[in-house]
């Protein structure tokens, strides 16, 4: 399964669409900021399953700040990351990953791409697909109980 991971789009729908067209994913995950962007992308690509969570700039108190997904045989948590303090360290995220036996912890918020394997858990931040910085996104590959991740610059070959 090829999964496109987006975060911090901040209104830049065209960059998200470019990533979808390039990667032709089996699924899309949007990690917040902005909720409406994820909804618009889901409307544009109704045949691609999507999961999304609100970010710190989204006013969606009725929505869960994080979701636990089962992708293949993998336990994957998606969140914006601000509730786990990811701007300063991955300590809280790491404790949560260990406690919840996560195979992957996906977060955004920092606008900085990151792929890091700690113990059994893959930590992936796709960076920002929005405006201002060099746009990036993430790719997850899931096969059974194996999960791998990478980040891609939108302006480079995937």
Model-derived regions: residue spans:
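Active-site-proximal beta-strand elements of phosphoester/diester hydrolases
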Residues: 2-8, 75-82, 122-127, 149-151
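Core catalytic region of metal-dependent phosphoesterases/phosphodiesterases
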Residues: 2-71
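Active-site environment of divalent metal-dependent phosphoester hydrolases
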Residues: 10-14, 35-39, 57-62, 84-89, ...
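Binuclear metal-dependent phosphoesterase catalytic core
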Residues: 15, 22, 65, 72, ...
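Short, Asp-centered acidic motifs that coordinate Mg2+ and/or phosphate
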Residues: 26-27, 76, 104
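Short acidic, glycine/proline-enriched helix-loop-strand junctions
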Residues: 43-52, 116-128
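Glycine/small-residue-rich loop that forms an oxyanion/phosphate-binding "nest" at active or ligand-binding sites
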Residues: 51-52, 57, 63-80, 85-100
């Amino acid at each position: 399964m090829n999964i496109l991971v987006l975060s911090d789009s901040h209104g830049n729908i065209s960059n998200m669409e470019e990533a979808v067209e390039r990667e032709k994913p089996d699924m899309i995950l949007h990690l917040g900021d902005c909720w409406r962007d994820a909804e618009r992308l889901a409307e544009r690509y109704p045949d691609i399953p999507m999961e999304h969570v609100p970010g710190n700039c989204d006013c969606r108190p009725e929505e869960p700040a994080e979701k636990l997904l089962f992708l293949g045989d993998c336990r994957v948590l998606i969140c914006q990351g601000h509730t786990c303090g990811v701007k300063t360290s991955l300590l809280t995220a790491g404790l949560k990953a260990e406690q919840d036996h996560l195979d992957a912890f996906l977060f955004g918020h920092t606008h900085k791409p990151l792929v890091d394997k700690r113990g059994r858990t893959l930590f992936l931040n796709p960076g920002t697909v929005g405006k201002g910085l060099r746009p990036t996104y993430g790719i997850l590959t899931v096969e059974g109980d194996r999960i791998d991740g990478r980040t891609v610059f939108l302006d480079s070959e995937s």
